[in-house]
Amino acid sequence: MVRPDYEGLGTRGPHPYLRGESLARAMSDMALAVRRAFPEVGRHWVAAGHSEGGVAALNTGSRTGPAADVPGLLGVAAITPVTQVDALATLLGDAPVAAPPVNVVVSLAALILKGQATEDRALRRLLLKQGGLSPEAVALWPDLERLCLEDLGGTDSWGGLSPQQVKGPRGDEALEEMKNGLRADDIRHLRMRLDLPIRIDAGALDSVAPLPLTVQLAEEYRSRGYPVELAVWPAEHSPTADQAAPELAAWILDLFDDTTGGTR
């Protein structure tokens, strides 16, 4: 088991949150580095992750992405992968209050804006210098480099702002830029490697990756002929990973068994 050095997390610099190409590149770099340093582990591997890590795993399975040329990928497993955040932003974009689940969506949107702004200087200027964000939101921008999603949702951070309080004079313009970027980079649109086993674990109580959107993702993949196994757990976003872990581990080991003829 190896953890990738995601850009800006395992390495210095800003983290392009939910940016599929960066995430898949980190996964493929990890696999190649292990192969060079520890050739005895073999060439076969499985990409797995939770939340943003699930997005990374699915992007790793794309037949057109940075990891497409890395051989030996047996399957991908995504626990509560985030999809259709643009729909959540549209649904809650005018909410006047900061309360669950609005605080979660606000925090998630802030991380996404930060990720997009690391790759788009014009968007960064719009957000921080040209009225895309309110002064209160600009003051909280540094939190995006030091806090995780759960802490960002607190009342002393982005979770203390309603969607309306996040927006500056050009807030609607910034919101549309964010949604356009999300639509273009959504995991729904990935062209996956053919015949690559895909497992998706969803939380029935998930407020970050709502179950109906995750089910829709699985159905869209299946409609394109991708082999998808979907499991649903009675949990919120992060606890889903703990509940899914034993069954997911067995699924991964079965992939290796199929390759090695039953010897692990």
Label each residue range with its predicted role.
Residues 1-11:
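Conserved alpha/beta-hydrolase
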Residues 32-38, 42-104:
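Primarily recognizes the serine-hydrolase "nucleophile elbow" in alpha/beta-hydrolase
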Residues 170, 174, 179-181, 208, ...:
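C-terminal catalytic histidine-bearing segment of alpha/beta-hydrolase fold enzymes
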Residues 17-38:
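Alpha/beta-hydrolase active-site loop
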Residues 60, 196-198, 210-220:
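Short alpha-helix in the alpha/beta-hydrolase fold that links the catalytic acid
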Residues 194, 199-206:
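Short beta-strand/loop motif that positions the catalytic acidic residue
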Residues 14-22, 48-52, 169, 173, ...:
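Alpha-helix capping and helix-loop boundary segments enriched in small/acidic/polar residues
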Residues 82-189:
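Accessory cap/linker subdomain of secreted extracellular hydrolases
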